[in-house]
């Protein structure tokens, strides 16, 4: 018998996460590794768990994630977005809960580009009066 799976794609900064929710005991596997080993910071691990905690489904699904691009923060945000979208497909009644928690909104903030004549995006070279 084919197992029920729910898919969701999440994005944040330059990271893209393809998330698969499978009914199970609550394990989170990111790129073939356990998420405690993949994400070194406890705060970012909490970010990844936010949608499951908000919908009270923490032990109900195994989360299988393929994520690439960006750093730890971007990847954690992308995974959170992907899990939220997959949960929405699993049960549309979660929409209000996830929306109120702000978990369905794609965080549009990106790194600002460096401009010519400047040291960074906005940092100007040191000014010398004489």
UniProtKB/Swiss-Prot annotation:
<comment type="similarity">
    <text>Belongs to the universal ribosomal protein uS9 family.</text>
</comment>
<dbReference type="GO" id="GO:0006412">
    <property type="term" value="P:translation"/>
</dbReference>
<dbReference type="GO" id="GO:0022627">
    <property type="term" value="C:cytosolic small ribosomal subunit"/>
</dbReference>
<dbReference type="InterPro" id="IPR000754">
    <property type="entry name" value="Ribosomal_uS9"/>
</dbReference>
<keyword id="KW-0687">Ribonucleoprotein</keyword>
<protein>
    <recommendedName>
        <fullName>Small ribosomal subunit protein uS9</fullName>
    </recommendedName>
</protein>
<dbReference type="InterPro" id="IPR014721">
    <property type="entry name" value="Ribsml_uS5_D2-typ_fold_subgr"/>
</dbReference>
<dbReference type="GO" id="GO:0003735">
    <property type="term" value="F:structural constituent of ribosome"/>
</dbReference>
<keyword id="KW-0689">Ribosomal protein</keyword>
<dbReference type="Pfam" id="PF00380">
    <property type="entry name" value="Ribosomal_S9"/>
</dbReference>
<dbReference type="GO" id="GO:0003723">
    <property type="term" value="F:RNA binding"/>
</dbReference>
<dbReference type="InterPro" id="IPR023035">
    <property type="entry name" value="Ribosomal_uS9_bac/plastid"/>
</dbReference>
<dbReference type="InterPro" id="IPR020568">
    <property type="entry name" value="Ribosomal_Su5_D2-typ_SF"/>
</dbReference>
<dbReference type="InterPro" id="IPR020574">
    <property type="entry name" value="Ribosomal_uS9_CS"/>
</dbReference>
């Amino acid at each position: 018998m084919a197992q029920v799976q729910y898919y969701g794609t999440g994005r944040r900064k330059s990271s893209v996460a393809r998330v698969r929710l499978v009914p199970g005991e609550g394990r989170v596997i990111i790129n073939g590794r356990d998420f405690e080993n993949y994400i070194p910071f406890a705060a970012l691990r909490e970010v990844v768990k936010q949608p499951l905690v908000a919908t009270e489904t923490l032990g109900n699904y195994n989360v299988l994630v393929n994520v690439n691009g960006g750093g730890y923060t971007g990847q954690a945000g992308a995974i959170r977005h992907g899990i939220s979208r997959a949960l929405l497909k699993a049960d549309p009644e979660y929409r209000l809960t996830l929306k109120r928690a702000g978990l369905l909104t794609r965080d549009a903030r990106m790194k600002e580009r460096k401009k010519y004549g400047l040291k960074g995006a906005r940092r100007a070279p040191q000014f010398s009066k004489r």
